[in-house]
């Protein structure tokens, strides 16, 4: 076990094993409760999220997660409800059994077009709790195949085929219209409704593929400094296009869809500095 503060090679950060002991007991408890049956989707998430809690201990490393569930997974849809409660003295406390779920966003994925009421309910739930997001897979896949579905009309046609005739028919349409593709590449193209860890970029089998500019560290009046910051971020993230991934599926994903991005954080502070 690495001692606290030791530098980690690869993607960086420092070790902090302070939560490691808790991780093993939590995982043992989760698995013990499921003896004789399959884990539920939420229990699977908790296994990953408990590891994330361990990683961020000491606030010197980061973890981000996106959990995508089937559209009809009712347990997942309500997993974060009643996360907080008040005792008789009015003090708020978090449910210790659910605490780790805060480490990831929960999104239900629709492969057919959701009704207006479904969308309204999802947005309303997000307004009240910050959770309850839904995703329309055909649109995500269409956006992620922009190299072949080059305009809105083609994307609309794909979405219509996928929604009304199913994923297999949409797959055949892509292959006959723009292929032939290998089965492996076709599988990858049709699975591009996955997300990078913070959800900025659609795709499949991603590590974090984003560089971030901290706007709150930049002078709002210094345009040259801003250009240099974003240029540095672009050069930094471009390194991932040459990173030697150990896992084959990550290497294949980069081969089929070599996408990286630049984003920013601290916009609110940036605007305060700029406008008061």
What are these regions (language model features)?
Residues 34-46, 55-67, 240-255:
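Flexible, glycine/charged-enriched surface loops at secondary-structure junctions
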Residues 18, 22-31, 50-177, 264-276:
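Conserved, charged catalytic cores of large soluble enzymes
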Residues 1-38, 42-46, 179-186:
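Catalytic alpha/beta active-site cores
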Residues 16-20, 24, 40, 44, ...:
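Generic structural signal for well-ordered, non-membrane alpha-helical segments
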Residues 1-9, 125-275:
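Function-dense linear segments that define catalytic or interfacial modules
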